[in-house]
Amino acid sequence: HRQHRFRQDHARQSHPRLADVTSGAILVDGVDIRDLQPDMLWQRIGLIPQKPYLFSGTVGSNLRYGKPDATDDELWEALSVAQAADFVASMPGGLDARIAQGGSNVSGGQRQRLAIARALVLKPEIYLFDDSFSALDLATDARLRAALVPYASRSTIIIVAQRVSTIANADQILVLEDGEPVGLGTHDELVATCPTYAEIVASQYSVEAVA
């Protein structure tokens, strides 16, 4: 819940409370996040950064980070939603396949999908995707989002994105220009009422293709 303006960098940081808003408040279930203990807040949020970090170990140990007791079935379900099951299954050892420090032995898109799967295993109340689909091709992006909706139906999903197709079906879209909010609404509402958003849509796709 946003009550006053804050810049894009602050918007990304404020939900997990890496920084506090300078005015207004962010509420989770009606409670100001500044009134929550940081560790309690973090337990409710699954953060997936644009450039995620993978630890030296196995695919399974990376996915179990934060939930050590997750079963193999839970891991494969999360991998399936994240569109990562096929490439993990093709790796020698599957869940036991080795991951180099920082994930240097997998591609950028594979790192993003593994990080998304890691967050999905936690099943948090809030998912914060910080441009987490940027390394994915459009088809993979679309399949992942379609699978994410039923999987995370009990959670709030917040997506920071540059690509219109990634957020076109969101319940609410907040448009930022130079770090300032210039529009809030659904895709169709913003195409009709927000020149900045309409220009972005026109520059990326035809309105008909996205709607």
Language-model features and meaning:
Residues 127-130:
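Catalytic Walker B motif of ABC-type/P-loop ATPase nucleotide-binding domains
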